[in-house]
């Protein structure tokens, strides 16, 4: 927080019922889906010091079964890259990004990092977990839906959360859902900075 900034008070808690009363919000910018050749995407991503970050894994409904990560989402202003991960292979460009000084803002990042380390050993750097930030700020409501509601004033849909992220082609709804999650993380971080909390 700069010396001239004044904190704008933020509600510290919101109920599930209050969240459900809010209008749905979603990312309306450009969505770029890539299956390989990630280098050009990171030329663009590397121009930014703060990015939104999320991952998706095909859900499993059998006890003890664990699927590999299928998608990594990186948000920059006005654009979200959806990086498809096939056969558990994380591209070297992604590793460079994960180990870089670029801030990567997400929610529940320990699970994301653990899933990525199952595929490839790396040293994560500059990862900012909004759940941990919320705890430090005394915000009782955590998770993307509640933090988006508190900070951004809209409801994030989770309708595609349990869809198949290994589909040959992602549906329009999947793309929008995945992009919205990463974008919302970036927007929450920016809003907290704007209000003088970071």
Model-derived segments and spans:
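N-terminal accessory regions of nucleic-acid-interacting proteins
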Residues: 1-51, 115, 119, 130, ...
């Amino acid at each position: 927080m700069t010396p001239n900034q004044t904190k704008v008070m933020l509600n510290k808690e919101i109920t599930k019922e209050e969240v459900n009363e809010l209008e749905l919000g979603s990312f309306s910018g450009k969505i770029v889906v890539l299956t390989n050749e990630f280098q050009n995407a990171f030329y663009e991503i590397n121009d930014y010091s703060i990015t939104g970050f999320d991952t998706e894994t095909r859900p499993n409904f059998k006890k003890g079964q664990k699927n590999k990560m299928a998608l990594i989402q990186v948000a920059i202003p006005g654009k979200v890259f959806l990086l498809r991960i096939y056969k558990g292979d994380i591209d070297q460009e992604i590793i460079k990004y994960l180990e870089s000084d670029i801030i990567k803002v997400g929610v529940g990042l320990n699970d994301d990092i653990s899933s990525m380390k199952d595929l490839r050993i790396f040293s994560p750097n500059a990862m900012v977990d909004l759940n941990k930030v919320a705890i430090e700020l005394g915000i009782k409501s955590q998770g993307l839906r509640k933090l988006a509601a508190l900070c951004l004033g809209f409801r994030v849909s989770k309708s595609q959360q349990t869809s198949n992220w290994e589909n040959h082609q992602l549906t329009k709804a999947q793309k929008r859902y995945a992009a919205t999650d990463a974008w919302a993380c970036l927007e929450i971080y920016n809003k907290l900075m704007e209000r003088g909390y970071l």
